[in-house]
């Protein structure tokens, strides 16, 4: 029988500061002084109580500053419920990364985890989302923009013509998207910000369809207009 026992959450929570060099005698490391307090403490919603009640109590007892913000993120569910080994429905991150790549997995998780509610993940949903967003919407936009810029101007596009109404409309959408995304990121609404970004990408693809650079390229007299359209597309993308 042990004579001394330590509450598991006391031991676990203090690792946030001891791991970066906190010293109770006042000799904390430069890394601790640089990194603490945390600007954002990102945790799972199931352990909010420990991070917003117990952890602040521990820190105040030590006269150490509290994290500036705490965000309890939602869960990713498999189908209609939690993943469980007993149910055999667990998705392992390593398997997803090996198949899709780490950036694609990161994108899906950020997109499918709403601010207020739990998200859903499955192999089928990942394939559908990545094909729809990264391949069709973003991939198509990047491919069209680069291909036409290389084909018609050797990859170097200069502003040679005056902007028309359709150009100014795209510019306004870009500016408005920046403001909306910045505000949502400040509020940790990452999924909502991603939705706004991809709405812009869809607008850019529509702009290409509206201006028809491939038609303009057939008329040498419209070379300046062609350059302007591709410049706006490049800047927006």
Q: What do these predicted ranges mean?
A:
Residues 1-5, 232-237:
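Conserved small/polar residues in nucleotide/adenosyl-binding loops
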Residues 112, 125-163, 170-234:
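Helix-rich, typically C-terminal accessory recognition domains appended to large enzymatic cores
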Residues 88-92, 166, 173:
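Short acidic-hydrophobic sequence patches enriched in Asp/Glu that either
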Residues 3-151, 193-197:
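Structured secondary-structure scaffolds
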């Amino acid at each position: 029988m042990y004579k001394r026992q330590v509450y598991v959450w006391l031991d676990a929570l203090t690792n946030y500061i001891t791991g970066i060099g906190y010293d109770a005698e006042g000799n904390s490391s430069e890394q601790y002084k640089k990194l603490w307090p945390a600007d954002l403490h990102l945790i799972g919603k199931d352990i909010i109580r420990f991070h917003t009640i117990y952890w602040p109590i521990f820190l105040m007892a030590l006269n150490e500053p509290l994290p500036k913000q705490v965000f309890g993120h939602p869960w990713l569910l498999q189908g209609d419920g939690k993943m469980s080994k007993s149910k055999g429905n667990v998705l392992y991150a390593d398997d997803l990364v090996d198949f899709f790549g780490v950036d694609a997995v990161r994108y899906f998780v950020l997109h499918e985890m709403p601010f207020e509610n739990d998200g859903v993940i499955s192999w089928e949903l990942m394939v559908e989302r990545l094909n729809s967003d990264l391949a069709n919407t973003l991939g198509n936009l990047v491919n069209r923009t680069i291909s036409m810029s290389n084909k018609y101007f050797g990859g170097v596009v200069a502003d040679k013509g005056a902007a028309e109404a359709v150009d100014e409309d795209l510019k306004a959408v870009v500016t408005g998207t920046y403001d909306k995304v910045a505000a949502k990121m400040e509020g940790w609404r990452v999924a909502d910000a991603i939705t706004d970004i991809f709405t812009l990408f869809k607008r850019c693809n529509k702009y290409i369809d509206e201006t028809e650079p491939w038609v303009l390229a057939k008329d040498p007299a419209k070379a300046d207009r062609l350059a302007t359209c591709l410049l706006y597309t490049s800047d927006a993308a």
